[in-house]
């Protein structure tokens, strides 16, 4: 379910050494399955463990996950990265905003999942997002851009060189992608 690197485990163990005996960590998702989903890690004293929690045992600690958060933390990774600027704890949870779909799910659901878990996190850096409107009978994914992508002069490159290549590689049954957006350049546009 969750992978915690050795460096992150060592970091947590150091922090837990200063807590009440038996305290571990809790990994959770607030607003799971929504565009506003946020992941977090907190201390979990022994009296805060619920009967419905999943206990994930690691070499140096135990991570507790509540029943509601569990499916959204599938494939999550926690790491502790040190570089020339300092140290930072990272938590990547590709399924926090949307539950992972089965490999045999309908094409529409699989494409929507790819957009939400892989493509939109990249576009979010520019204040943008893309939504799947439909998949045509001819096999074209019809997309609509929003936020910083609407009116951006680079949207055609993003669509053809980024999104289309990635989706066609992952979903060979697609023939291409089309942009439904009526682009209006404004202060919200990234470029």
UniProtKB/Swiss-Prot annotation:
Signal peptide range: none
Keyword DNA-binding: no
Cross-referenced Pfam families: Fe-S_biosyn, NifU
Binding site for [4Fe-4S] cluster: 149, 152
UniProt keyword Chaperone, yes or no: no
GO molecular function, one term: 4 iron, 4 sulfur cluster binding
Function: Involved in iron-sulfur cluster biogenesis. Binds a 4Fe-4S cluster, can transfer this cluster to apoproteins, and thereby intervenes in the maturation of Fe/S proteins. Could also act as a scaffold/chaperone for damaged Fe/S proteins.
Assembly behavior: Homodimer.
Protein name as catalogued: Fe/S biogenesis protein NfuA
Species for this entry: Salmonella typhimurium (strain LT2 / SGSC1412 / ATCC 700720)
